Structure formats: structure tokens, C-alpha cells
Amino acid sequence: MSISIETITKRNQYRVDQPQRQPSRLSTVASISEYQSDYSKTVFEEIELEVIPNKQNISTRSFRNDGNDSDPQTLDPDAYPPKRSIAFVLLNSILSDMSMSTALPISAAYTEILGGTDAFSGLVIGIPTMISLVCLYPMLRFANPKSANGYTLYFRPLIVSCISQIIGHLLYSLAYRAQWLYLILIGRMCNGVGFTMFLYHKKYLTDKHFVGQNRSTFLATLNILAQTVGFMAGSFLGGLLAKACMHLTNPIWNQYTVGSWFMLFAWCIYGILLSIFFKEIRADGNDSSARKPENFNGQAVKLSYTHKFMLVFLSMVAFISYFNIAGYQASVPIYAKELYHYNAFQSGNFLSLSALVIAPLVFLSTFLSKWAEDRDMMLYGFILGILALVVHLVLDVLHKVRVQPYFVLYSAMQFGFSIGSAPLISLATKQLHPKYHILVGIIVQIGISAADTVGAICGGAIFDITTVGFIALNLGIAVLVFIQLLFLWNSIKTKTG
């Protein structure tokens, strides 16, 4: 748009004299917008400036400048990071869950042949997430250096996850050749270093620096879908490859190690592609999909008692949801072997078929975020999970747990608690000041990591605890957090999206 000299002269007659400003660091476009805004205040107050989307279909940042450049810059509610970067994060989520679940169908048999017990098998399944919890703080320091100016450098934990997963799967596969039981555990502990990415999956897809409020719940639910797909694929491949190599006697490549070798190759390919194509969002001001980290002008922002209680509540929701999920997943091969005489291949098919049923339901639930609040999704998910546990408990007491109802109840419970825990980070980022967003991610991840470890151990020892005791334990803690949800109902109301 061209502006004639006469027009500018007329405009200057109406402008209020202002002290001369120093050149701003903002772009020329932002400066023109500021000039038009000042002019519209004096003469054309009815004129509104339209935000024009850029080439990436992400609206340019709108600035509010009251003479103080430190004011926070607002982000378009529909903004999102580069699509290829979202794809790499979701693919990492899928591969991480595959690494977690590939060992499920064969873990009990693998540990038994090397002299281990069912409880040790549960430890092998659950120990990686506990290691990820221990490595969480060093990874936070590594991914958030001072040079990043408040941004998280997501490429760093992504590449660390690749390297640690490759090493972990290598050691796990060589345990049979070495005939050393604890090498399985060491390999899974190396996998645990890579599982610190479980925090960054959620954080990247809800990061307020470049994810708009209308996109956060949708992307967070997509992550749950990715986890479901990864678990389905890992369980199926673990059982299928074990069956295909059942008669092999090679100490390197056999039914116990083939799934781990497969994942090693998959992580190598992913790491190469990640290094070439992943696009990092940096604090250089050139990427219009991001906003600058906010300057809080030194003002202390304290949490209210309600917000503190909410943080405790979110951690409990994460713990109890994943305790149920991980506990049942670890118990399926043992429970089904005792009741239905399932082998590793059949157990893997059971787990993967359940995930296959859940996946489209999780996908459909991603669209609910446009109409349903985060608290509504949590409520419906927990109601479904609790009902499934109640029915399973009754059938188990009556000794009438046939395989078909067990499959339906297991799938309903998994789906319910997956959806119930999906909007935790999104809910917190909508409620709390951005200063506390990293803290929220850490608290939720602590709950998840502890639950994955403790739940897997309890699931592996299901017959030591007794089946009734195990189901009742899951039901009791789920009811506890459900009561807390009702107590906090009015305090966690948020916008949809």
C-alpha cells in the first residue's frame, strides 16, 4: 500500500507530539503496524487492522506496544510448530512405545530361561521409566541451556533418545549370548535414558512458545494416539517375530532377541532422518511460528493453594492412570498363560489387538477437544476405566473370567485411563502462569515414571498379590483420584481446544 506525501502531512497534523523513540528491534512490518495503530487512535478509531497469515499458514505475531518493548508478545491461538517437526516427535513417541512393548510378550520367557522369576520380568519391563525419572533433571539442563534464551532445544533429547535406545537394544539382544540375566536389566536401563523423551513429547506438543491454545489439547491427544499405535505395533511385532524365530538356535538371533534387533535397526534409521530433516525453533526472532519467552519484569508470580493442590492432583492422576495401564499390560502374558494357556505369540496378539481396537477411538477423541473441556475428557475417561475394573473384579471373584469379556474389559480400561490422562499438560498450561509450565511437565512425568515401574512390578507379581487383590488395588486408587476430580471440578474449568 502506497502512502502519498500529502496524506502523511495531513496525518501529522493530527498526531500528538511524542518524545522521539529509539529504534526498536521489531521488524519494519511491526513498526508500520504501530504507526497505523497510533494514527487510528487519534482520527480513525473505527479502523481495525487485520492479521495476515504467513506462508506457513501461521498468523504473524500481534504485538502490543505501550512504549515498553518488554511486554509479552501474543501468539495466534491456532499456531503450531513445523509439521515435519511434529511428525518426528510423534514418530519418536511411537518408536519409544514400541521399544517399551516389544519386550512384553517374551519378557517372562526370556528371564525364565536365564534364571529369572516373574517378578524380575516385571522389573525388566518397569525399570526403564524409573531410570528416565532419574535422568530427567540432567536432561532438562542439557535441553535448556542459557544460550537458548528460555527456549527448549528439543533436538538434543531427541538425538539422545536415539543413541540410548540403540545401546539398550544392543545389550538386551546380547544377554542370551552372554547367558547373563542382568545384562537384560542393564539394556533396559539404557532404554530408560531414552524414555526421558516421554516428557518432551507432551512438552513439545503443548509448548506455549509456539503452540496456540486452540491446538494444545488436539496435539496432546494425538500423542496419546501415537502411544497407542506404538504399543500395538510393538506388542504385535514382539509376538510375531518370536513365533517366526521359535525354532532358531542361533545365540544372537533367536525368538528372545529378534524383536530387540528389529527396534535397533528402526532407531538407527530414525536417527539419520532426524539429523537431516528436524527443524528446531530457536530464539533468533526469525521464525514467525514462535513467540519470545515472556519477560516477567522481576515480578514474583506465586501459586495459590488451589493451584498447588491441582499440581498434586495432576501428579496423582498421571500416577494412577499409568499404574493401571502398565500393571495390566505387564500382567496379561502371566494372567493369560495361567487362565487360557497363552504363549508369547498369543499374548502379543491379545495386546496388539486391544490397541488396534483402541486406536480409532483415541483418534476420534482428538476431535472432542474442540467441543469438550479438558475436565470433561478426564471425567468420562475415569468413569469408563472404573466401570471396567468393577466388572472385572466381580467376574474374577466369581471365577467367570472368559477370554472375550476379559479382552473387552481390558480394552475399555486402557482406553478410559488413556483418555483420562491425555489433557493433563494442556489443562495445566491453560490454568497456570508460563513460569510454571516446565514444573508441571516434571511433576506429571514423575507420576508417570513411578507408575510405570511400580505398576509393571505389581502386574508381574499378580499371582503373588492374588488377582482379586491386584484388581481391587487398581480400583481403589482410581476411585480416590475420581473423588479428587469432583472436588476440584469448578477450579479446573478451561476453554475448549
Curated annotation (Swiss-Prot):
GO CC terms in record: membrane
Xref: Gene3D superfamilies: MFS general substrate transporter like domains
Origin: domain of life: Eukaryota
Membrane topology field: Multi-pass membrane protein
Pfam short name (any one): MFS_1
Transmembrane feature ranges: 86-106, 120-140, 155-175, 180-200, 222-242, 258-278, 309-329, 348-368, 378-398, 407-427, 438-458, 468-488
Keywords of the record: Membrane, Transmembrane, Transmembrane helix, Transport
Any one GO molecular function term: transmembrane transporter activity
Major location (coarse): membrane
GO BP term (any one): transmembrane transport
Span list, region Disordered: 58-79
Claim: Cytoplasm is one of the keywords in the record: no
Localization per record: Membrane
InterPro entries, sorted: MFS (IPR011701), MFS_Domain-Containing_Protein (IPR051068), MFS_trans_sf (IPR036259)
Family that this chain belongs to: Belongs to the major facilitator superfamily.
Protein name as catalogued: Uncharacterized MFS-type transporter C613.02
Species whose genome carries this gene: Schizosaccharomyces pombe (strain 972 / ATCC 24843) (Fission yeast)
Lineage, top ranks: Eukaryota, Fungi, Dikarya, Ascomycota, Taphrinomycotina
